[in-house]
Amino acid sequence: MMNATTSSTEERLSVGNIELEVIRRGVGRSVLLLHGMQNIDPRARFLDLLGGRAAMIAPSHPGFGHSARPADFDTVYDLVHLYLDVLETLPSERVTLVGLSFGGWLAAEIAVKCCHRIDRLVLVDAFGIKISDRETPDILDVFNTSPQEVQRRSWHDPGKWAPDFNAMSDDELVVRARNWEALCLYGWHPYMYNPQLQRWLRRITRPTLVLWGASDGIVQPSYGRAYSALIPGARFELIAEAGHHPEIEQPEAFVDRIVAFLDQ
């Protein structure tokens, strides 16, 4: 399969003395895409499909991919404030914000703080809230679960889509390790959620689509339904035969759902 952490893209974006590697695709309506637990492979099919309908920019978060992380940059709120700055640099007055997995948490936080720069919001298998009791985990602890089990629960068809680490280049392996380290730094405690976010999701006033892989074993569809119910007017949709990465396993269905939402 296509690995999820290929070599650096050529483009860079400088914001507030932080330099981010970015992927750009397409023309038209502006879309800011925030990646999940791994940075986005520029060969991913969904990029070209979505780029056929929108002008998309997909940065690698500081510490992920080939984006450097400043020494004092270590919380989700550093990321949120960075992307608030990124929104101010984009030429469009309003953009569609799409967040995948961990990036969905960031997107929700940004939308709570800054709806005036957002046209529409798409959350895809997003982290960020706590819906169960204190003793019941909502999100699989990927750091304390065997790699084999993480892969099994990440994909509808892991035999087809799980990354082959033996086939990765040295650069890809280094990037994947950097991604894992950065994810742990930003999201370890509390694990992948903000205790206050659930209360403030009511502040999101822009049209919102919550997309979920029907076979997601990292964070179950029931979590996605609960997430959607906390955002006024949000719509929840499942993508069949997809796990935690519907943009990879079902790129056509993923893009079709987003384009239909944008066209409404």
Can you describe what each PLM-predicted range is?
Residues G16-H66:
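Conserved HGGG/HGGXW glycine-rich cap/lid loop of the alpha/beta-hydrolase fold
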Residues S215-V219:
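Acidic catalytic loop of the alpha/beta-hydrolase fold
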Residues F46, L197, R206, Q220-A229:
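Short alpha-helix in the alpha/beta-hydrolase fold that links the catalytic acid
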Residues W105-K113, D119-E149:
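Flexible "cap/lid" loop of the alpha/beta hydrolase fold
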Residues D170-R199, R203:
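Hydrophobic, aromatic-rich cap/lid helix
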Residues I57-V98, I248, D256:
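Active-site loop/oxyanion-hole signature of alpha/beta-hydrolase fold enzymes
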Residues I204, V210-W212:
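Short beta-strand/loop motif that positions the catalytic acidic residue
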Residues A234-Q264:
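Catalytic active-site module of serine/aspartate enzymes centered on a nucleophile-bearing elbow/loop
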